[in-house]
């Protein structure tokens, strides 16, 4: 189930890379291209016979052992956004960006195009248009995922959240504004084998 595997990816990417390691800061675009091409070449051998979910699983496995590094993207409210592709080190979000983009790509060129569509609103490389929150994937065009939380458990709870609000006057990430959004989640006490099986 395509929807569920995206949800599952978000969970495993955050716990699977939780231990920071020493990351390289000198990773070149040539090395990035070589790694992406190697992954695409390997998975393309099976592409015709693999479903989207199977491609995601195959590509994800190629990132096992990848060092964790936060803040690899370049851009802020005071600095021009640049497109970064650095699959040598990942955090929860860049891991998802890279895997989804590769799952839709057949070459370096199509991978870069997919990465722009995955990471940014309407494919425009801009800090304020970057999808900063995972729920952006299900809300902002182009949509990368669907929120299936309510489909997999009758015990889902939905709350109103003010994303990026630190307090009444401050933002966690300056320049993004406060984003009001309804967030659905499954309480830990309601996560049982039946729920987990629906994520497979």
How would you describe each model-predicted region?
Residues 4-12:
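Sec-dependent N-terminal signal peptides
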Residues 12, 51, 100-103:
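Functionally constrained cores in energy, signaling, and assembly domains
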Residues 13-18:
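N-terminal signal peptide c-region/cleavage motif recognized by signal peptidases
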Residues 21-94:
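Cationic-aromatic interfacial patches
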Residues 63-200:
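Acidic/His-rich structured neighborhood in mature extracellular/periplasmic domains
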């Amino acid at each position: 189930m395509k929807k569920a595997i995206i949800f599952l990816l978000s969970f495993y990417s955050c716990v699977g890379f939780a231990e920071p390691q020493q990351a390289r800061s000198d990773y070149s675009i040539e090395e990035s291209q070589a790694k992406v091409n190697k992954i695409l070449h390997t998975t393309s051998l099976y592409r015709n016979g693999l479903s989207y979910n199977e491609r995601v699983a195959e590509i994800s496995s190629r990132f096992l052992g990848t060092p964790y590094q936060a803040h690899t993207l370049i851009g802020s409210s005071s600095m021009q956004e640049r497109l970064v592709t650095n699959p040598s080190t990942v955090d929860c979000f860049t891991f998802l960006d890279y895997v989804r983009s590769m799952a839709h790509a057949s070459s370096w060129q199509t991978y870069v195009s997919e990465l722009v569509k995955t990471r940014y609103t309407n494919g425009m490389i801009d800090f304020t248009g970057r999808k900063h929150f995972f729920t952006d994937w299900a809300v902002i065009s182009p949509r990368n995922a669907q929120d299936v939380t309510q489909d997999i458990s009758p015990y889902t709870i939905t709350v109103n959240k003010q994303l990026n609000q630190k307090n009444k006057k401050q933002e966690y990430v300056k320049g993004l504004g406060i984003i009001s959004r309804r967030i659905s989640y499954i309480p830990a006490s309601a996560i049982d084998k039946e729920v987990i099986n629906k994520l497979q």
